[in-house]
From Swiss-Prot:
Its EC number is 3.1.1.61, 3.5.1.44. The modification 4-aspartylphosphate is found at residue 57. One of its GO terms (biological process) is chemotaxis. This is Protein-glutamate methylesterase/protein-glutamine glutaminase 1. The gene is cheB1. Residues 6-123 form the Response regulatory domain.
């Protein structure tokens, strides 16, 4: 049996440290080896034991988290998960941390409903496990899930020949998780101003997808924004599912639209790639082009197989360029992938598929 993932928690709030320690310690696949109130205390802790993952706050006294992150990545690289506030300032700092090498982001736990606390526990534990795997760039021992995995059946029926829509309009659907923020930037920066409409699910906490969309919008030639319920899918535009909401592709006459709605965690996620992919299989069928990028777990694999079976062109990111080769690996294993490509080749391949060549 593989040893538990060792985690060091660094946060200036004693309450947050204790809450995170309690949530993580409840998972048999995780061991909290220490907590620290600031980076200086953390450095002392690391002299005694080197963790597999550091859970790091950004705003701290004496030394902020970004400075500590830079030091970690230049002196002793380790997987780092950012534990951030949900403020606008916190979101911007989080994306700066991702540029410096952090591999995951979670929101600070807070008191709430039973459902909120249960879902927070799942997301935090999954983020830590994903970060631990990111260092290895390969799939390792898979621990038993602590909560049931619902499938896309929880949100909509599977595709059938009856539901396939006869149309020639192409639409692109993309799913990503760990490492996806940088992968999506590479993918979207390669898109021309008249690119086909794109719908994206990136596993990310609530309140961060808006800032992420604005960041991409400022550097890409296409328009990128957080999706709202009823949005029309348009050429030259990418819609990113809001954190904590599912996004489904729909068809309204001659146009594709998106439905943004609440619902249970599907494949332990909301938004779920499987939900987006299944809806695309139902309403776009062979007119969809799908890409599954870096990420831990299996969200999107079943949905990609459904897209493939309906005649869609499907692409998976290769292991060499993935931060975590989990979601693409599972999609390949299920037989739902037409092509396996390095990250920088995916956008050109998507455009060729949309052009019918």
């Amino acid at each position: 049996m593989a040893r538990p993932c060792r985690v060091l928690i660094v946060d200036d709030s004693a309450l947050v440290r204790q809450t995170l320690a309690d949530l993580l310690s409840a998972d048999p696949g995780i061991e909290v080896v220490g907590t620290a109130s600031d980076p200086f205390v953390a450095a002392k802790r690391m002299e005694a034991v080197v963790p597999d993952v550091i859970l790091l706050d950004i705003e701290m006294p004496r030394m902020d988290g970004l400075t500590f992150l830079r030091k970690i990545m230049t002196q002793h690289p380790l997987p780092v998960v950012i534990c951030s506030s949900v403020t606008e300032q916190g979101a911007e700092a989080t994306f700066k941390a991702m540029e410096y090498g952090a591999v995951e982001v979670i929101t600070k736990p807070r008191l709430g409903t039973k459902r909120f606390l249960e879902e927070s526990s799942i997301r935090i534990c999954d983020a830590v496990k994903a970060a631990a795997r990111a260092r290895l760039h390969r799939l390792g021992h898979r621990t038993r899930d602590v909560a049931p995995k619902l499938t896309a059946d929880a949100m909509l029926p599977g595709p059938t020949n009856f539901t396939r829509v006869q149309t020639t309009e192409k639409v692109v659907v993309v799913g990503a998780s760990t490492g996806g923020t940088e992968a999506l930037q590479v993918f979207l920066e390669a898109m021309p101003p008249d690119a086909p409409p794109i719908a994206i699910v990136q596993h990310m906490p609530e309140h961060f997808t808006g800032a992420f969309s604005r960041r991409l919008d400022g550097i890409c030639r296409i328009r990128v924004r957080e999706a709202e319920d009823g949005d029309i899918m348009a050429r030259g535009q990418a819609l990113i599912a809001p954190g904590s909401s599912h996004m489904l592709l729909k068809r309204n006459g001659s146009r594709y639209t998106v439905e943004v709605k609440d619902g249970p965690l599907v494949r332990r996620h909301r938004p779920s790639v499987d939900v987006l992919f299944r809806s695309a299989a139902r309403y776009a069928g062979a007119n969809a082009v799908a890409a599954i990028l870096t990420g831990m777990g299996d969200d999107g694999a079943a949905g990609m197989k459904e897209l493939h079976d309906m005649g869609a062109h499907t692409i998976a990111q290769d292991e060499a360029t993935c931060i975590v080769f989990g979601m693409p690996h599972e999609a390949i294993r299920l037989g739902g992938v037409d092509r396996v490509l390095p990250l920088d080749a995916i956008a050109p391949a998507v455009l060729k598929a949309c052009a019918g060549s």
